């Protein structure tokens, strides 16, 4: 299906796995229509979408035409709804809210990835806009954010957004950029784990995105170092039950393991996903609630 009748000059929307957002604990195995928007408050030297981040060549999505596309795709098994990404969706919030309302009227879900520009206040004023949220952290210190040209308070805004979303019953997952083998990044990772353990809840998914600033892009298929593997192991062991290397495709650390019995309950090294080891979010081996929201139509 072509979507050019409602897309922006940036490019057409496209259908992707919800794992590509990435969201691993919300409707795993389902697909979403990805809506990209331009602009970003940060200036990351390793940005893998610099044209999108800087582009001003954009026009709002047409809500009625988007709704028609969603209704057409809705007949496909496992189609969940739309995913706002980019870019920073908060820069076009009125369009996001208007379009998301149409998607919900069509009986589908809305997920959104943000660098922290979506504030707790925006979420409070538009409580039914988003069903699931990925909050992307570029580090976990004000110093790191300053080096990326961040507006003042963006890290604190991101933390407040996560807490507000959880309180509102929105599904939340987190992402942290990791410059590989950098001790300072390891320290920020530990600080983020402590925040999750103290102020949030054990079991919230945390995605590590491996980056290589010297190459100027995020690593999608590069080798995984012992440093990264140690971070995942320590996170799973100490504070957070679910830590993933989400952009290192095919790695064992993309799998969802039960934090109690350590069984692999979602294997992401193969397609389609095998969800036979989890029922209603419960580990099929030991009965532990692993916090997965499953598509009720999933066989």
What are these regions (language model features)?
Residues 1-6, 49-59, 265-272, 290-297:
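Iron-sulfur (Fe-S) cluster-binding segments and ferredoxin-like electron-carrier domains
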Residues 2-132:
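Conserved Radical SAM active-site core
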Residues 33, 82, 110-112, 133-135, ...:
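Hydrophobic faces of well-ordered beta-strands that scaffold small-molecule active sites
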Residues 51-56, 147-152, 220-221:
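Short glycine-enriched, charge-decorated loop/helix-capping segments at active-site entrances
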Residues 74-102, 144-160, 166, 176-192, ...:
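Conserved glycine-rich "GG(E/T)P / GGGxP" loop and the immediately following alpha-helix
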Residues 78-80, 106-108, 129-131, 168-172, ...:
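Short, well-ordered coil/turn segments that N-cap beta-strands
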Residues 89-91, 117-123, 132-151, 171-183, ...:
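Conserved radical SAM core fold
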Residues 167, 180-299:
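Auxiliary Fe-S-binding modules of radical SAM enzymes
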């Amino acid at each position: 299906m072509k979507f050019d009748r409602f897309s922006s000059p940036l490019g057409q929307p496209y259908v992707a796995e919800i794992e590509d957002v990435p969201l691993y604990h919300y409707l795993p195995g389902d697909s979403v229509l990805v809506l990209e928007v331009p602009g970003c408050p940060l200036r990351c030297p390793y940005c893998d979408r610099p044209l999108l981040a800087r582009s001003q060549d954009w026009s709002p999505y047409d809500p009625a035409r988007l709704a028609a596309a969603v209704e057409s795709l809705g007949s496909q098994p496992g189609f969940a709804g739309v995913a706002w990404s980019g870019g920073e969706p908060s820069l076009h919030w009125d369009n996001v809210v208007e379009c998301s309302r149409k998607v919900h009227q069509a009986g589908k879900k809305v997920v959104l990835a943000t660098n922290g520009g979506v504030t707790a206040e925006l979420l409070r004023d538009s409580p039914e806009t988003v069903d699931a949220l990925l909050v992307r952290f570029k580090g976990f210190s004000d110093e790191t954010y300053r080096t990326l040209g961040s507006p003042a308070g963006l890290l604190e805004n991101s933390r407040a957004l996560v807490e507000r979303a959880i309180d509102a019953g929105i599904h939340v997952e987190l992402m942290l950029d990791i410059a590989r083998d950098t001790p300072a990044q390891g320290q920020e990772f530990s600080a983020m784990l402590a925040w999750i353990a103290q102020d949030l809840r054990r079991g919230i998914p945390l995605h590590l995105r491996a980056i290589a600033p010297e190459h100027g892009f995020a690593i999608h298929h590069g080798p995984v170092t012992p440093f990264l593997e140690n971070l995942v192991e320590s996170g799973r062991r100490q504070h957070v039950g679910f830590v993933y290397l989400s952009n290192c495709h095919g790695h064992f650390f993309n799998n969802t393991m039960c934090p109690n019995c350590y069984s692999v309950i979602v294997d992401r090294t193969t397609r389609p996903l095998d969800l036979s080891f989890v029922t209603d979010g419960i580990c099929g081996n030991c009965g532990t609630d692993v916090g997965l929201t499953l598509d009720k139509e999933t066989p």
